[in-house]
Amino acid sequence: MNIKISNANQPSWKVINVKSHIPEALKKLDELAHNLWWSWNTEAMQLFASLDGDLWKKVNKNPIDLLRSIDYDRLIELSKDGETIARMDKVYGDFRKYMDVKPDAKRASVAYFCMEYGLNHVLKIYSGGLGILAGDYLKEASDSNVDMVAVGFLYRYGYFTQSLSMDGQQIANYEAQDFDRLPIERVLDKDGYQVIVNVPYPNFMVHAALWVANVGRIKLYLLDTDNEMNSEFDRRITHSLYGGDWENRIKQEYLLGIGGMLALKQLGIKKDIYHCNEGHAALCNVQRLAEYVESGMTFDEALELVRASSLYTVHTPVPAGHDYFDEGLFNKYMNQFPARLGISWDEFMGLGRTNPDDKGEKFCMSTFLCKTCQEVNGVSWLHGRVSQQMFKDIWPGYLPNYTHPNHAERSHDEWFKIYNPHPEESHVGYVTNGVHFPTWCAKEWQAVYAKYLGKDYIYDQSNSKIWEKIYNVPDEVIWNTRVLLKNKLIDYIRARFRENWLRNQGDPSLVVSLLDKINPNALLIGFARRFATYKRAHLLFSDLDRLSKIVNNPDYPVQFLFAGKAHPADGAGQGLIKKIYDISQRPEFMGKILFLDNYDMQLARRLVSGVDIWMNTPTRPLEASGTSGEKALMNGVINLSVLDGWWYEGYREGAGWALTDRRTYENQEHQDKLDASTIYSMLEQEIIPLYYARNRKGYSENWVRTVKNSIACIAPQYTMKRQLDDYYDRFYNPEAARFKTLVAHDNQLAKDIASWKESVAQRWDNIRVVSSERSENLQNGALVSGKEFSVKHVIDEQGLDDAIGVDLVIMSGAEGNEEIYSVMPMNVVGREGNLYTFELTSSVDLAGSYKVAYRMYPKNKNLPNRQDFCYVRWFI
């Protein structure tokens, strides 16, 4: 038998790429789609939706995917449609007018480094608040027309997509991104080939392909190692955000800092200021130091220039947010740099240690940045104070206070004025985070604001006078806008639950029962954030009987929405999600407490505009900022929060609700129970009655008044416009001005400062107090309030020329809780050779028990702050 049942060889496939052919008349659409400006321009998004509404939803509102997927016949039809062409021309005209404005040359230019960017849900290169903040920042930089460039990663898988099993277990799904379907472009060289950045790791080379995301006027350059030039292990460097082990983490941070700087150098880009948004980008300063040294400068001279042009923003006081590397692992990747820098390995390691002499201490990226950046800042008033305390041991001899004044209603400027009563003790500052208004404000609210505040309100977002016009908006407009957005959210939730139930093959009768219990007329409270334990998502469930009475009141119904992801390695966070899910499935809570999976930017926009109350309950003071509440208030949503992060500054009586900023119990479990009871009481006695106090027109006048107060009194202070302006006023422009003086005349001042520091360091141990004289009352420690005392010290400066300063430092408070009462500078009143005479006459106004000591330090008018050269000697 010669005939076989089958006879076939394996196919050999050839990959071909079919690009969508966009008719010439519609070419402008492609340019619009490749600039993320569309993501915060309502008319642009409406334009894309009008091409094919069903397909627009199917491609998850991704214009690149839309243009690739739309039927060619439909494109031909649209190219001949006058209305479509007119709409496209209008949007494109607005876009070109926006793009063609030249950057503001009066402001410093900035290179911005961050591990993640939340620009739009279709570009999955973010995980949470840090990335969203960075994305908003680039958008506002574009809107404000500043000269900025950004560097990050193009992740193949990004952060995980979350789903829940039928029993409430978090499932982390990693879905590969198709880069050709994203609003990004390859960076091409002059020959039309994609630019490859060759990053020299020890003993091997990593080849990073370079992409660009156009964020309005700002270019975000993205490094991508997932290509055939790299080994399997190196391709993984840009696979996942915060994925892998510690070795992959250091490879990522090496690529971001060193590879990012090499990318900018290859593109010919130099900026005035280099801003490290979190510690992940710390190694950019290693590369910058190396380049200065290799240009002929000493390490100390190079450090002056790098420090003077660098800013480090810290985003968390939580230890897990600061990367520490074992010396062995750090040496594996960084051992070539000491020779390039002209220093020893121990000196290099010391830059990342709080105590450089502690050989057992790991290398901390945050510590390294504190030592190589002139300026360091937290992301809210309170977080700035916490950061001063967190980093104080890096600059021994200075005593920043952790205490803070009782909360009071103050303007943003007033908070800044009371920030640091003793600025000589710490240079660590703050800029309170804001949010990008066009991204997070629902189009329905934008229409209200444009009508009643004036169309130009968007260009002057931080002007409180403009926002006061909200009081002129009819109450019915405020209430109806809130109801409209809540109904849209409810419809979205119902669709999500149906889809998820079908995907999990759940009992259809259960989902029908659940959806029937969702009440669009109920007071709706939202809680959505990263599920770390300090966020205290469990707080509401401390007393289930009391909670059941709240949600099951037939006359005043209340519903709660929860959303958020826990890191795949965070078992406790995942346990919280399961606990909430399990409670939500109990009969008394079914449809009253809902957990929505896969919290991303798309869901976040719906939540912050659709709920009535935004709840935030972190363990104080671990919430650095917490911008979701800022997004909510711009949409007429009222905040209920712990006085922490931005809300410590933002809270105003009559414009939201706050838990006290004072801790009652040291035991955290007891404090949690007290805070939970407080929340229940506020809901029962204030919030719920206020919401349901309806007038004859069916709305609560006092609720609307609270919404208006929230918008008028708080919103203008928490825009990204205000945040960007603060960075320029407090950090970028002053640093750039100082840097300009340092590099003038072939870096002469930088060289002079480095030489002066070397001279002081050589003499420091020999500088001595020759004699001291004190008034009798000070000598005996028996001062009387209001009565003067005097002191005189003669100091041998060992040949230095008026380079020493002396403070009298007075401390108050019990042992372990001391605070600075006063820092009194002593004055130089005479000189004989190397001997300088310092005198002080002063008094203490308040009776009490104090400690006093004298502090000697080097002084130089060209230093930006005392921590820049932290030599201190105490004496009594």
What are the functions of these language-model segments?
Residues M1-I876:
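Catalytic cores of carbohydrate-active enzymes across secretory and cytosolic contexts
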